[in-house]
Amino acid sequence: MSEIADKVKKIVVEHLGVEESKVTPEASFIDDLGADSLDTVELVMAFEEAFSVEIPEDAAEKIATVKDAIDYIEKQKAA
Amino acid sequence: MGIVSPLGLGLEHNWSRLIAGESGIGRIASFDPSDLPAHVAGEVPAGPTEAGCLTLSDWVPVKDQKKMDRFIHLGLVAATEAVEDSGWKPESEEDRCRTGVMIGSGIGGLQTIYDASVTVHEGRARRLSPFFIPSALINLVSGHVSIKYGFKGPNHSVVTACASGVHAIGDASRLIMLGDADVMVAGGAEAAVCPLGIAGFSSARALSTAFNAEPEKASRPWDRDRDGFVMGEGAGIVVLEEYEHAKARGAKIYGEIIGYGMSGDAYHITAPAEGHEGAYRAMQAAVRSAGIAPSDIGYVNAHGTSTMADDLELQAVERLFGDAASQVAMSSTKSAIGHLLGAAGAVEAIFSILAIRDNVAPPTLNLDNPSTESAIDRVAHEAQRRKIDIALSNSFGFGGTNASIIVRGV
């Protein structure tokens, strides 16, 4: 797993208070990890802070799963 | 009923320590108060639950803690104890809709507002937590309690500074009388022992500063050496229930609210009027609504904050009781826990009910030399056994708001 993926997973575990094993790439923040809409806003902010990236609102709305987050951040970092 | 206070966690633990004459006041531990004029406060002791201390994760899941200011944490702790103690677990939708919540606070999420202000000031407004607003809002204690237990009745809150706790319980009892609910979870929660809170009340010259080296002596209602109040934090919550409803389900009934009175001073933003005539009128209204004579009251839990206003309240109580003044005991439990602001009235109403249950008047600590003589026994230093059938509890707030509540054993 990439360094980015590791860090994303860690942030998700910390912010949503879920077991690490549940944070699979396919896991949906809202459907599988018990987040509500405010949790996802906070999560996106935590990603922005941790990776020094800007995630505009329209992009944030499309980040529904752990993999979505990892892919988006990896793309930003590669650019 | 449920209490979390500087004396610790839990109703009976608080009560036994209070009656034993113990103090919950100490040097401020949650931050370094050295730069501020006042160094003492009553803070809820952290530690293991079984030792009567607070381990927050036993009460609020870690992931939810950051979504709430500390006053909400403390409100949830006391509400949980109160609801479990009441045994009220509404199963039907109708029963849930007939159960409401009215928990007040004087100040709300002050530390949360401070932290958020710093974030914005640093140009990081886009980093502000989405939980900032719901963490700081005063009515969110009521909100969280309703969500936790599924209570779908009236969801309300009270903000009347240091009278919030009594107003919440009094108003909630009126909602039951008016038929809006059968059961109301009511009380107050406060956690303003933070740099902004201490600095703000210090600036208003309201806090004690002369006993920084001897914290336990700082809260000394009616004593000639008192020099301001000591801030405390905590929460007091009761479950109020329509009498026949409670009887029908065989509920444990601690007591009955028989009187409630309110008034406004229309005088000054922080100082009470001459002779505390607003307090007199609130007590008078409570006595009238209870349909009793003042002489029926065996114990008064005073507002008694350890400020100059103590003697004005004393005058008002003397005026209310007249010739019966020598028959009544009056104490200020703020001498042991400090002034819990918006939670004070709720915690003190609970102490008043326990005073009736156990026929004991809790003490006024540090009352070494009363500044004014009075026929009223102010229960200096040690608790007193005495027959108490009816008790009155006073709370007054900035803005000139006064509330009195009268309770009776069942």
From Swiss-Prot, chain A:
Q: Which GO terms are recorded in the biological process aspect for this UniProt protein?
A: lipid A biosynthetic process
The Gene Ontology terms for molecular function here are:
acyl binding; acyl carrier activity
From the UniProt record, give the pathway where this protein acts: Lipid metabolism; fatty acid biosynthesis
Tell me the Pfam families matching this sequence. Answer: PP-binding
Q: Where in the cell is it found?
A: Cytoplasm
Q: Which residues cross the membrane?
A: none
| Top-level taxonomic group | Bacteria
- Transferase listed as a keyword: no
Q: How is it modified after translation?
A: 4'-phosphopantetheine is transferred from CoA to a specific serine of apo-ACP by AcpS. This modification is essential for activity because fatty acids are bound in thioester linkage to the sulfhydryl of the prosthetic group.
Gene Ontology cellular component?
Answer: cytosol; membrane
Tell me the residues on which O-(pantetheine 4'-phosphoryl)serine occurs: S37
Claim: Phosphoprotein is one of the keywords in the record? yes
InterPro entries in alphabetical order: ACP, ACP-like_sf, PP-bd_ACP, Ppantetheine_attach_site
What HAMAP family has UniProt attached to this entry? Acyl_carrier
The entry's family comment says: Belongs to the acyl carrier protein (ACP) family.
Provide the protein name. Acyl carrier protein
Lineage runs: Bacteria, Pseudomonadati, Pseudomonadota, Alphaproteobacteria, Acetobacterales
Coding gene?
acpP
